[in-house]
Amino acid sequence: MLSSFDDFPIHQTSQPVARTGSSDLNHYDRYFFNGYTRDTRLYFAAAMGLYPNRHIADASFSVVVDGGTADARQINVHASRRAPNDRGDANQVGPIVVEVLDPLSALRLTVESPEHGIRCDLTFVRRSAPLEEPHFFHQVGQRVVMDSTRMTQFGTWEGW
């Protein structure tokens, strides 16, 4: 199945972009972010995962206010949907959206969940170049348990 990304020279296999290079049901692409205010009063974490071989996209956003005190509060938002075949539509899951503004330099995270009392519009701006972590391969007997490469990057957050 062709998708809007097939117009770009980004293919990693001879197949359309919508088809993964692995038949592993656990194959995924994922974002994970966290941040805190300078006074450390507020901490948040966000994640968004695309599991194309399971046709699932999941996202979560968690915020902790006054952590480490008797008044600490935590609010969580979780969302899930059928994963779209077109990866161009994969970065919105329920009220959580991740937008790539400048590849490897700036990303926008928005959450619009008034029923949970959470709204945010945050932009991650890199402070360091992305670091490709060493490739991780774990096998038990003949079964591959994990075959992955991750990227880590430091930056600052702007917004509300």
Where are the model-predicted features located?
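Targeting-peptide/extracellular-domain and disordered-appendage signature
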Residues: M1-W160
